[in-house]
Amino acid sequence: MSEFFNCWTKKRIDLIDWQEKIIRDIFGTLKPNGYRQFNTAYIEIPKKQGKSELAAGVALLLLCGDGEERTEVYGCAADRNQAKIVFDVAVDMVRFCPALSKRVKILESQKKLIYKPTNSFYQVLSADVANKHGFNTHGVIFDELHTQPNRKLYDVMTQGSGDARMQPLYFLITTAGNDTNSICYEIHQKALDIDKGRKIDPTFYSVIYGADEGDDWTSPKVWKKANPSLGITVGIDKVKSACESAKQN
């Protein structure tokens, strides 16, 4: 999938540069056997950057793009309504794409998409799934990881659930949180440790968008660093206005 669909204007738009890089990195970095190198991807990004569109695109790539039979892709979040946000964007992408709409069956009442050529599905899970086991997971889209009340759902969906698949992907995407006891903070710290060379895990991919300690928050360069879609999904005038207001406080 080389493009996303703008669900508000119903016009096709190109991937934003940062979105394209993430897609290329995750799906284009392969092991010698031809399967994906990365099993876990952690993306931390502020609101209004195109997070849901990216997550929906990844879900559809996992559903339709790998050519594997009977793949199971799940949408998870702190509650079903949150997980439904990404699903709804994916539904719009399917409806506005003739190639997908011919091949994907939409079951809105079940929050489920079925890719008919391989009998694969993408489904939103309910909150009580943390008490269940037995998933044969090809992909998990974990939205707003920082809102998880504990690590139970994360563990159920990532520990052993994809062992029978050749290239499972756990795609974790979230805005920043502040609970240092959460699973999100644990994954965030792992991402920093790998980035700084303190840990090594070739199966783990991460991108964190945000200002570092000591950055000048009044600098447009820092605004762009923390908001990769600045000027596209986020108007620069709004950021300027917010900055000026903050200076007065």
Where are the predicted features?
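Phosphate/NTP-binding elements of NTP-utilizing enzymes
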Residues: 1-249
